[in-house]
Amino acid sequence: MSTATASPAVKLNSGYEIPLVGFGCWKLTNDVASDQIYRAIKSGYRLFDGAEDYANEQEVGEGIKRAIKEGIVKREELFITSKLWNSFHDKKNVEVALMKTLSDLNLDYVDLFYIHFPIAQKPVPIEKKYPPGFYCGDGDKWSIEEVPLLDTWRALEKLVDQGLAKSIGISNFSAQLIYDLIRGCTIKPVALQIEHHPYLTQPKLVEYVQLHDIQITGYSSFGPQSFLEMDLKRALDTPVLLEEPTVKSIADKHGKSPAQVLLRYQTQRGIAVIPRSNSPDRMAQNLSVIDFELTQDDLQAIAELDCNLRFNEPWDFSNIPVFV
């Protein structure tokens, strides 16, 4: 198996450190998840980005447990994240949801617990359907729940006080929501996770968040590639970034793969990345994106590919107004 040096880490505003390169658990299927997590740990990965909605936390936990049991890694050397799903935003459900996650992962705490989306939906009991996805218990109708974000955030702050989450963060938030949140919170978000790739660079949001000492993690670093298997028309109709001439030219110049260039475009600017791969060689390549530098001309050429093209758009699924 190919191995790579563990990713360097950056310090969060909570004082903890997060690796710049992690392993994403989105779309990691149940039949391979445990083995993939185990292999990733053996390859040098220490950050694992998960979520309640990914429906694989039990298997992820099995892979972690195996690696710890074999002495490959200690729990304190790992950085495990999860995300609060929309159904559990009510303050009485926040701890319940995290306890379910911790039970599935077989862990005492997570290193970072995000709010997955800045919108609350009608809750569904865990025993009825878990994870519920966008199901609200009323056929196919999506229903909003009247829960202010600040109430949800204060419930997350209590999780930190209880030692159930070392740090807390936000995902898919706009600058306006962040502006409002940091003026009413006691514990500041340590991180913002957003869709980020050359077709969607969101430069003003990135600048605003970094000015407030909030770490950014970019998901879907390869743009449409992450959404092709979902048969998403917007992704199918978009040129694949891994084959984009500018990206390929820069990759050839540096003797790297297009995937490594796309990841380095983010990490060189301080943005953490969470790619997923089933191939041991690509897993090692993805982790090895700190050992070369893109020039300013490279960075500018990649940035010029931006066309504000978002693929993860909940409005397309159920008219859910996250980004509209």
UniProtKB/Swiss-Prot annotation:
Top-rank taxon, per record: Eukaryota
Binding-site residues for substrate, renumbered to this chain: H116
Residues flagged as site, Lowers pKa of active site Tyr: K83
Residues annotated to bind NAD(+): 220-286
Gene3D superfamilies per the UniProt record, alphabetical: NADP-dependent oxidoreductase domain (3.20.20.100)
Leader sequence segment: none
GO MF term set: D-xylose reductase (NADPH) activity; mRNA binding
InterPro entries named among the record's database cross-references: AKR, AKR2B1, Aldo/ket_reductase_CS, NADP_OxRdtase_dom, NADP_OxRdtase_dom_sf
Record EC number: 1.1.1.307
SUPFAM superfamilies in UniProt: NAD(P)-linked oxidoreductase (SSF51430)
GO biological process, one term: cellular response to osmotic stress
Reaction(s) this enzyme catalyzes, per UniProt: xylitol + NAD(+) = D-xylose + NADH + H(+); xylitol + NADP(+) = D-xylose + NADPH + H(+)
Pathway(s) where this gene product acts: Carbohydrate metabolism; D-xylose degradation
Active site: Y54
Keywords: Carbohydrate metabolism, NAD, Oxidoreductase, Xylose metabolism
Similarity comment: family membership: Belongs to the aldo/keto reductase family.
Biological role: Reduces D-xylose into xylitol. Preferentially utilizes NADH as a cosubstrate.
Identification of the protein by name: NADH-dependent D-xylose reductase
The species this protein was found in: Candida parapsilosis (Yeast)
Gene of this entry: XYL1
